[in-house]
Amino acid sequence: MRVHTCPVRFYYEQKEALSESDRYTICKQLSYHLGKSLNAEEIWNEVMTVRPAVDPSLRDFLGICISACSKTAWKPAVQTDVRVASDKHGIAGMIDRIDENGMFSIIRASGAMPFGTYAADRLRIAAVALCLEEMTGNIVEGGNIEYIPDGVSRFHAVQPRDRRQLIATQHKLREIRAGGMPQHPLNAPCKQCKYQEKCESSVGKRLSELL
């Protein structure tokens, strides 16, 4: 999904080891308790087991998440961390939660938009839907995006534009892996990017031209 956000950043990051943030660890661990009593002490102990070096000050962040999530009626999960894959499309991923009705959810450690969902999250839902359709043989209408810090769950119905964007993203990925240096999108988040100088000096060239 990082290709969709900014393919140039993905180009530079593709050989770097990825690690989840402390905030994500907290939100992810809390998600296992949704639909049940949210005990801050219990969840924090689990967080420290999963991530011993977690920033202690983020205990307050956990409290904020619990307060927000306590205002929403959640369905407990019957399955968690379910791997999905599509051989046809060459994609794979993980579903965070599946409820008793078969509805799937992905967990986000960011706040929710006032309305709707982020483009990258819509793409995640579309990718999971494609995987599930291939695995089950059934049409998948969409899935939930659960913004833990705000205690918000939003259903996104997959649209044709989501599937088109997913196909375009796959094309970008193949080009990058073939050695191409992609163009950055017009709305790329350049100001917060650590690769901004590299991007401005080399965008549009192929890897062979940079060596």
For each feature predicted by the language model, list its residue ranges.
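Short amphipathic alpha-helical face segments that pack within enzyme cores
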Residues: L123-C131
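Glycine- and acidic-rich phosphate- and metal-coordinating loops
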Residues: F104-R108, N144-E146
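Metal-dependent nuclease catalytic regions and adjoining charged, substrate-binding loops involved
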Residues: K75-G90, F115, E134-L211
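Short beta-strand-loop-alpha-helix junction that forms the active-site gateway
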Residues: I107-T117
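Active-site catalytic microenvironments for nucleophilic, acid-base chemistry
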Residues: A17, C131-M135
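Well-ordered beta-strand positions in beta-sheet-rich domains
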Residues: A92-M94, R122, F155
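Short, conserved loop/turn and helix-capping segments at secondary-structure boundaries
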Residues: Y118-L123, P160
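Metal-dependent nuclease catalytic cores that hydrolyze phosphodiester bonds in DNA/RNA
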Residues: M1-I98, M103, L211
